Amino acid sequence: MTDSESPTPKKSIPARFPKWLRQKLPLGRVFAQTDNTIKNKGLPTVCEEASCPNRTHCWSRHTATYLALGDACTRRCGFCDIDFTRNPLPPDPEEGAKIAESAKALGLKHIVITMVSRDDLEDGGASALVHIIETLHTELPTATIEVLASDFEGNIAALHHLLDAHIAIYNHNVETVERLTPFVRHKATYRRSLMMLENAAKYLPNLMTKSGIMVGLGEQESEVKQTLKDLADHGVKIVTIGQYLRPSRRHIPVKSYVSPETFDYYRSVGESLGLFIYAGPFVRSSFNADSVFEAMRQRETSTSSLLPNKD
């Protein structure tokens, strides 16, 4: 469990990489096929742009998370490896068609799209994102779509425009506990993120709402528990919890490696609050997103079947 109080990045990374963070890389034919399919379309993925440690695992399962609205972000968060720019390119009007072709080639039934923050656009990129989603609905009408969106700088109209596009899961990450947010996230606030999540839950009560946090940044156990309570109180249904891993020496250092037992503990805390928790050292927002979606759908179906008839 984590016990550091200071968020300042002055301490070095813990000396030893624990055994639970060592994994075999399942490279093979399927990985190569996924790699070729994505690169042939010239599509950025968060798997590559953010240096995700799960890329080989996911691509070996014919799954990937598409990065929409470019490969450079207008924010420079201390944990993220995506390139920063003050002058990003305009949204690509053909991006939806490219993602659809790639998703068809991979045989995706659950499509996950994340986005860079586009503070240069009036609606934060919501309209461009909706255009992509509408294209996917046309080209892959049976596929479900999960979107990991930015906070749109608190623009509720932009959020509602996105939610009206008929997505299966709305995901927006708080990323860390409230105390550490100013040191971890650029131009974002913990309370604004909670506000966006709560608004989504109230706007579409049947929508699956999702958020995620990283641990190992210097948070207290009590702060993680409070964050889970905050998410539950603001209408979130699914929460992912994973170990923060430093992409490079210019990023925020790791303060601690959280044990599998602690992840199990956080899972039990979240479940006691009614949350669906997916927690573990390698868990990321979109890691095994298709399986999480199916498990959540089965849980909701099971719960609804236990409810009394209204007649």
UniProtKB/Swiss-Prot annotation:
[4Fe-4S] cluster 2 binds at residues 73, 77, 80. Coiled coil: none annotated. Binds 2 [4Fe-4S] clusters per subunit. One cluster is coordinated with 3 cysteines and an exchangeable S-adenosyl-L-methionine. One of its GO terms (molecular function) is 4 iron, 4 sulfur cluster binding. CDD domains: Radical_SAM. Its cofactor is [4Fe-4S] cluster. Its EC number is 2.8.1.8. Its main location: cytoplasm. It catalyses: [[Fe-S] cluster scaffold protein carrying a second [4Fe-4S](2+) cluster] + N(6)-octanoyl-L-lysyl-[protein] + 2 oxidized [2Fe-2S]-[ferredoxin] + 2 S-adenosyl-L-methionine + 4 H(+) = [[Fe-S] cluster scaffold protein] + N(6)-[(R)-dihydrolipoyl]-L-lysyl-[protein] + 4 Fe(3+) + 2 hydrogen sulfide + 2 5'-deoxyadenosine + 2 L-methionine + 2 reduced [2Fe-2S]-[ferredoxin]. Pathway: Protein modification; protein lipoylation via endogenous pathway; protein N(6)-(lipoyl)lysine from octanoyl-[acyl-carrier-protein]: step 2/2. One of its GO terms (cellular component) is cytoplasm. Keywords: 4Fe-4S, Cytoplasm, Iron, Iron-sulfur, Metal-binding, S-adenosyl-L-methionine, Transferase. It is found in: Cytoplasm. Belongs to the radical SAM superfamily. Lipoyl synthase family. This is Lipoyl synthase.
